[in-house]
């Protein structure tokens, strides 16, 4: 093993000098004598390599010895990782002893070839009305939850995990990328209480960790998911939050000497996103269904980071601050959310017609809002008054109590089957429930519950 020494330290970026005939390759893992792991990013010439620290660089000094491991970072994979919490290097952080893995895989892998890839049109039922109706998920597809700060990305993701992981008997991998430690803790206990912890591998690189950890932790989680997929399983891969992955790249990019591009992001933004997203795919042996939370800075969907993510997804679920301010949760915007699966050939004609009917009614209501604000409801035609009444019922019926939010509001969560969702909205559009007051539709599960409520009013 070649040995070098540290010659420069700037934050998370460290330069190491090696003998000219033993310069490490890009992505090789280096070990500092203090125990810190570095990953080679650039070769600067003269035997010097520039690395990112996968851990804090506090206490390092020039002249410390560094050993080249001659291989990239490797992490444990396989069933031994289930029920465990690990860091970016695959080391356990749950104080439950060693992982005891039988195999380790490198975190840098090629995406499956074009011939190996497979696509599926099988739907994945989530039990969340607005998602199943407007932006249905495909098994083996990629889903993005877009939203600004505090509109409910993590709660939506936890509900999806709870519903899908309980209904779906396969394995899941959760990568916490630059999120709050508190959320990681909540998530762990949620999984434990739902008795699905033994089917989930948890990998965390939290907000308080150096950018190197946050940049690589998504790849660590993905590698574990790929192993399950290559064994012929259908695996769920959850990432919270993709934006922090981009941000970690931005933090180290300037230190690596790259010129910033639009809005100060790294010039390699699209490539870094592509490297991660192209690996999250389904093959002929197994599938990876991924759900990714995407933070939207300042609620601006045209920001380069969320805009780059959009291109890779099959379904986009957009959370809206306006809907959250009305007290309607989940605060999903039915006019902004899209899915490639919403096609009569995939979901069937009835589902397609109901979904488009709901969007058409809500869009008409949106257009009428200006007239209502200036002239009032009385100036509308009878037809328009009916559209407004139905749209307001639809808006409220799109809300639903979540199981994971039960601890906060004491309202029992509801899982609504897709058939019930379609039946309910079809009835509202057909005018079957015009006699029911709109407040009966708020935070209800199925349409039968609404009718029952209305009878008690």
UniProtKB/Swiss-Prot annotation:
Reactions the enzyme catalyzes: ATP + H2O + 4 H(+)(in) = ADP + phosphate + 5 H(+)(out)
UniProt keyword annotations, A-Z: ATP synthesis, ATP-binding, Cell inner membrane, Cell membrane, CF(1), Hydrogen ion transport, Ion transport, Membrane, Nucleotide-binding, Translocase, Transport
Assembly notes: F-type ATPases have 2 components, CF(1) - the catalytic core - and CF(0) - the membrane proton channel. CF(1) has five subunits: alpha(3), beta(3), gamma(1), delta(1), epsilon(1). CF(0) has three main subunits: a(1), b(2) and c(9-12). The alpha and beta chains form an alternating ring which encloses part of the gamma chain. CF(1) is attached to CF(0) by a central stalk formed by the gamma and epsilon chains, while a peripheral stalk is formed by the delta and b chains.
Main location: membrane
Gene (name only): atpD
This enzyme's EC code(s): 7.1.2.2
High-level lineage: Bacteria, Pseudomonadati, Pseudomonadota, Gammaproteobacteria, Pasteurellales
Family that this chain belongs to: Belongs to the ATPase alpha/beta chains family.
Sequence positions that bind ATP: 147-154
Transmembrane annotation, as ranges: none
CDD domains: ATP-synt_F1_beta_C, ATP-synt_F1_beta_N, F1-ATPase_beta_CD
Keyword flag ATP-binding: yes
Name of the protein in question: ATP synthase subunit beta
Membrane topology: Peripheral membrane protein
Pfam families given in the database record: ATP-synt_ab, ATP-synt_ab_N, ATP-synt_VA_C
Enzyme class: translocase
């Amino acid at each position: 093993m070649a040995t070098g020494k540290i010659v420069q330290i700037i934050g998370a970026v460290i330069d190491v000098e090696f003998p000219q005939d033993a310069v490490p390759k890009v992505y090789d893992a280096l070990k500092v004598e203090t125990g810190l792991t570095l990953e080679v990013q650039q070769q600067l010439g003269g035997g010097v390599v520039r690395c990112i620290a996968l851990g804090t660089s506090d206490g390092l000094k020039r002249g410390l010895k560094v050993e080249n491991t001659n291989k990239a970072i490797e992490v444990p994979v396989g069933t031994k990782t289930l029920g465990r919490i690990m860091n970016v290097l695959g080391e356990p952080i749950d104080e439950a002893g060693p992982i005891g893995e039988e195999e380790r895989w490198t975190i840098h892998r090629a995406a499956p070839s074009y011939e190996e890839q497979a696509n599926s049109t099988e739907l994945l039922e989530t039990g969340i009305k607005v998602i199943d109706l407007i932006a249905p998920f495909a098994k083996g597809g990629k889903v993005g939850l877009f939203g600004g700060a505090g509109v409910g990305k993590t709660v939506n993701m936890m509900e999806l995990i709870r519903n899908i992981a309980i209904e779906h008997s396969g394995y899941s991998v959760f990568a916490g990328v630059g999120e709050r430690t508190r959320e990681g803790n909540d998530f762990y206990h949620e999984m434990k209480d739902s008795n699905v912890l033994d089917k989930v591998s948890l990998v965390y690189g939290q907000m308080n960790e150096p950018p190197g950890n946050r940049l690589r932790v998504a790849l660590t989680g993905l590698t574990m998911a790929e192993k399950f997929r290559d064994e012929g399983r259908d695996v769920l891969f959850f990432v919270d939050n993709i934006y922090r992955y981009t941000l970690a790249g931005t933090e180290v990019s300037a230190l690596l000497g790259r010129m910033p591009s639009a809005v100060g992001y790294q010039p390699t933004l699209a490539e870094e996103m592509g490297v991660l997203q192209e690996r999250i795919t389904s093959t002929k042996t197994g599938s990876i269904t991924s759900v990714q939370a995407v933070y939207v800075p300042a609620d601006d969907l045209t920001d380069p980071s969320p805009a780059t993510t959009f291109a890779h997804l099959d379904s986009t679920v957009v959370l809206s601050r306006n809907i959250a301010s009305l007290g309607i949760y989940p605060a999903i915007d039915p006019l902004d959310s899209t899915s490639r699966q919403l096609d009569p050939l995939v979901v069937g004609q009835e589902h397609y017609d109901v979904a488009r009917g709901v969007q058409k009614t809500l869009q008409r209501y949106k257009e009428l809002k200006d007239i209502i604000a200036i002239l009032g409801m009385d100036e509308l035609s009878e037809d328009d008054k009916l559209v407004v009444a139905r749209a307001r019922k639809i808006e409220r019926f799109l809300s639903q109590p979540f199981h994971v939010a039960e601890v906060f509001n004491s309202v029992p969560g509801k899982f609504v089957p897709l058939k019930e969702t379609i039946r309910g909205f079809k009835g509202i559009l057909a005018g079957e429930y015009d006699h029911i007051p709109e407040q009966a539709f708020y935070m209800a599960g199925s349409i039968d519950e609404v009718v029952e409520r209305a009878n008690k009013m």
